């Protein structure tokens, strides 16, 4: 048979104070006491029910547990009940943590109002912005401290009061078999204080939703994957607790000329046939402007030239990377008649006596092909 609600047994509401509980118990105990109702089994049963209800509701800790868990708080040995050493439906992690805390003199401290959440903002940068550094304004949605209650969560002119259940401790003690354990107070949720008259603007939270604008200084040399932390610029904490942090996640967009690898920059520089063969001087782009690059004679496609200190300044040290220029020899197109004649003359000169000296890689390749086919026919 299911047990009746203890408040119902004593004819009380759940907001009844200690005096009302004691008064109700005395009145009902006198009415159903076995000495006044000898032989009446029904009165005896009711008296036991009244006594059990009073033992729980007159004890602040037991009452708090009953308000949170109901009769389950006292089943299987909870609060020293006879029989096994069960935990009455309470959370195992809380129980074991608090048992060992009590044994070794620790125990849980009063929970503080929750710190504000951290926020993340994804910021896209051009390569130039990332290399040189920049200050950017961002606008983010967040929770800020309520300006009406100044973060307290309480109505103007009032303040949070000490919790009457745990008397400000934030914890209630429960007896589990041979052990006394602690659990967060069900009334104040471990904070030790309750807000009876909440602020009309934030409804007791101490925070309100709004957008805020921030200036973020991006240091020179950042790269994709870098993260910048702005301490205290996250969401405001509950009821005056510390704010979280804001993390700006950097992403550098792809550049149409340069590729970045660490602190070095890479680019491809096309050169014409004549410059590659005879050598010369060309202009190449850098992030600081145009610079001259000397191309030696007989330069082949793929040749890499290093320009010291023309890369990216390291964000973590004083070092500066290099600019690596890979030349690509470009085949001439849209030749006029005179140019075609000159190219034909040049080609004939390559095919004549001693022409293999002008194109050693071609000769080496053709010799290799000839040997390959000769080996196949053997």
Curated annotation (Swiss-Prot):
Pfam families in alphabetical order: DnaJ (PF00226), DnaJ_C (PF01556), DnaJ_CXXCXGXG (PF00684)
Binding annotation for Zn(2+) 2: 163, 166, 185, 188
Ranges for the CXXCXGXG motif repeats: 146-153, 163-170, 185-192, 199-206
InterPro entries: DnaJ, DnaJ_C, DnaJ_domain, DnaJ_domain_CS, HSP40/DnaJ_pept-bd, HSP_DnaJ_Cys-rich_dom, HSP_DnaJ_Cys-rich_dom_sf, J_dom_sf
Record keywords: Chaperone, Cytoplasm, DNA replication, Metal-binding, Repeat, Stress response, Zinc, Zinc-finger
Binding site for Zn(2+) 1: 146, 149, 199, 202
Highest taxon in the source lineage: Bacteria
Known cofactor(s): Zn(2+)
Chaperone found in the keyword field: yes
GO molecular function, one term: heat shock protein binding
Residue span(s) of domain J: 5-70
One GO-annotated biological process of the protein: chaperone cofactor-dependent protein refolding
GO cellular component terms, A-Z: cytoplasm
Record remark: domains: The J domain is necessary and sufficient to stimulate DnaK ATPase activity. Zinc center 1 plays an important role in the autonomous, DnaK-independent chaperone activity of DnaJ. Zinc center 2 is essential for interaction with DnaK and for DnaJ activity.
Record family assignment: Belongs to the DnaJ family.
Entry function: Participates actively in the response to hyperosmotic and heat shock by preventing the aggregation of stress-denatured proteins and by disaggregating proteins, also in an autonomous, DnaK-independent fashion. Unfolded proteins bind initially to DnaJ; upon interaction with the DnaJ-bound protein, DnaK hydrolyzes its bound ATP, resulting in the formation of a stable complex. GrpE releases ADP from DnaK; ATP binding to DnaK triggers the release of the substrate protein, thus completing the reaction cycle.
Full protein name: Chaperone protein DnaJ
Organism name: Proteus mirabilis (strain HI4320)
């Amino acid at each position: 048979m299911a047990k009746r609600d203890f408040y119902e047994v004593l004819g009380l509401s759940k907001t009844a104070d200690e005096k009302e509980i004691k008064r109700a118990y005395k009145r009902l105990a006198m009415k159903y006491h076995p000495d006044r109702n000898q032989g009446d089994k029904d009165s005896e049963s009711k008296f036991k029910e009244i006594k059990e209800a009073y033992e729980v509701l007159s004890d602040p800790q037991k009452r708090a547990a009953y308000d949170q868990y109901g009769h389950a708080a006292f089943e299987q040995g909870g609060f020293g009940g006879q029989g096994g050493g069960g935990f009455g439906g309470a959370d195992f992690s809380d129980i074991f943590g608090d048992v060992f805390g009590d044994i070794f003199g620790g125990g849980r401290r009063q929970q503080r109002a929750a710190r504000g959440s951290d926020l993340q903002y994804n910021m896209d940068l051009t390569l130039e912005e990332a290399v040189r550094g920049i200050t950017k304004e961002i606008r983010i949605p967040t929770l800020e401290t309520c300006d009406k209650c100044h973060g307290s969560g309480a109505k103007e002119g009032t303040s949070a009061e000490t919790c009457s259940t745990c008397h400000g401790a934030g914890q209630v003690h429960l007896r589990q078999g041979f052990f006394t354990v602690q659990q967060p107070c069900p009334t104040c949720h471990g904070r030790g204080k309750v807000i009876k008259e909440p602020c009309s603007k934030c409804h007791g939270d101490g925070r309100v939703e709004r957008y805020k604008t921030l200036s973020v200084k991006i240091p020179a040399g950042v790269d994709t994957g870098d993260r910048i932390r702005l301490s205290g610029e996250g969401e405001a904490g509950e009821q005056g607790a510390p704010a979280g942090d804001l993390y700006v996640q950097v992403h550098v967009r792809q550049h149409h000329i340069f590729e970045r690898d660490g602190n070095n920059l890479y680019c491809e520089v096309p050169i014409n046939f004549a410059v590659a063969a005879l050598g010369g001087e060309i202009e190449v782009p850098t992030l600081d402007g145009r610079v001259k690059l000397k191309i030696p004679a007989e330069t082949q496609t793929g040749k890499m030239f290093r320009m010291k200190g023309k890369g990216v300044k390291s964000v973590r040290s004083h070092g500066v990377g290099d600019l690596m220029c890979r030349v690509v020899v470009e085949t001439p197109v849209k030749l006029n008649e005179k140019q075609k004649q000159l190219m034909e003359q040049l080609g004939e000169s390559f095919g004549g006596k001693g022409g293999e000296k002008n194109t050693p890689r071609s000769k080496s390749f053709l010799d290799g092909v000839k040997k390959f086919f000769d080996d196949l026919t053997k």
